[in-house]
């Protein structure tokens, strides 16, 4: 007897429709995340006509916009991008926690994969490193996660 293993790949998601929800706050970092995500999708055969970018004011607003996009436009996946940088107040914990929790709820309630590309970092330097320099581009990684999940969900139940 052989165990069946189901895994996603990056090819099955090429014909899918993607929504990218981007927080504008900390735009100097977020724009690099967006470019990374768009580049990753294009490199894997996703046409620009299959991608729509929605801009939220900041990370706290991303979950609601992602939820409405999921419900109203029914993309195959949502890619959430933003940057929350720790400061001297508890604001970071509130925004980062609610954003992560909200996006998880959107995914579970809608049945649409939501890839988490929202940086939650301690410093501007860490944000820059994770948006295309030393630590790669987390926007590109989120796009690859979305591609893989689309392919994986297509196989569930086959």
UniProtKB/Swiss-Prot annotation:
Originating gene: ribH
Single annotated GO MF: 6,7-dimethyl-8-ribityllumazine synthase activity
EC number: 2.5.1.78
InterPro entries reported in the protein's UniProt record: LS, LS/RS, LS/RS_sf
Alphabetically ordered keywords of this record: Riboflavin biosynthesis, Transferase
Name of the protein: 6,7-dimethyl-8-ribityllumazine synthase
Function: Catalyzes the formation of 6,7-dimethyl-8-ribityllumazine by condensation of 5-amino-6-(D-ribitylamino)uracil with 3,4-dihydroxy-2-butanone 4-phosphate. This is the penultimate step in the biosynthesis of riboflavin.
Known catalytic reactions: (2S)-2-hydroxy-3-oxobutyl phosphate + 5-amino-6-(D-ribitylamino)uracil = 6,7-dimethyl-8-(1-D-ribityl)lumazine + phosphate + 2 H2O + H(+)
Disulfide bonds: none
Family the UniProt entry places it in: Belongs to the DMRL synthase family.
Domain of life of the organism encoding this protein: Bacteria
GO cellular component terms listed in the entry, alphabetical order: cytosol; riboflavin synthase complex
Native species: Hahella chejuensis (strain KCTC 2396)
Active site location: 91
NCBIfam families the record matches: lumazine-synth, PRK00061.1-4
PANTHER family named in the record: 6,7-DIMETHYL-8-RIBITYLLUMAZINE SYNTHASE (PTHR21058:SF0), 6,7-DIMETHYL-8-RIBITYLLUMAZINE SYNTHASE DMRL SYNTHASE LUMAZINE SYNTHASE (PTHR21058)
Residues the entry annotates as binding 5-amino-6-(D-ribitylamino)uracil: 25, 59-61, 83-85, 116
Pfam families registered for this protein in UniProt: DMRL_synthase
